[in-house]
């Protein structure tokens, strides 16, 4: 986590969280505390291989063969004391969740974006929603038909199968004193030039990214 605001506290859960990455900080935004967390859930099972020709139950059974659902519930469990304070100290949680969102795999998109006719309640995004988190991008861009918000796949992927372009990177938030006011997704290919705000950069990732702007009361 990089911050232009002072980091006044760090949060680590090495004894209870075994994901690829999870941790956070508290930052001081002009006198207002905000907790910011970053996570990276397991990449298996590979979303590129989701069996969209199967039933909803079979797709969910395939997803549950991995550990992402267990990981997100452990994360939400250790966050409970902080979530209880979210109305006074807002929380932002972003990262590579390595799984789709139920907000994107809807009746309206079932025959778009190579979804193969599937409508899926992906459990990780459901868990985040049930824990009180808002998906900042989908809140600001509520129509997945008009704006899917692709963050993956890019040309860097070499798996020899027909690939969907989808959204598996998210910025969630919650709290009464914070509100998303803008959010965009950007996609680019690893190693290619990326132009952002008039400047050219070497792009260092095989994922795109999400840029969300928040307002604090």
What does each model-identified segment do?
Residues 28-30, 74, 175, 206:
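Short strand-coil-strand connectors
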Residues 1-49, 185:
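Structured beta-strand-rich core segments of catalytic domains in phosphoester-bond hydrolases
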Residues 59-87:
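A long, amphipathic alpha-helix that forms part
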Residues 3, 21-23, 67-78, 124:
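Internal, well-ordered alpha-helical segments in soluble enzyme and binding-protein domains
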Residues 37-38, 92-95:
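Short beta-strand segments
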Residues 46-66, 108-109:
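A solvent-exposed, charged loop/short amphipathic helix patch at secondary-structure junctions
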Residues 81-92, 99-217:
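Metal-dependent phosphoester-hydrolase catalytic domains
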Residues 17, 63-67, 71, 116, ...:
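Extracytoplasmic/periplasmic, Sec-exported soluble proteins
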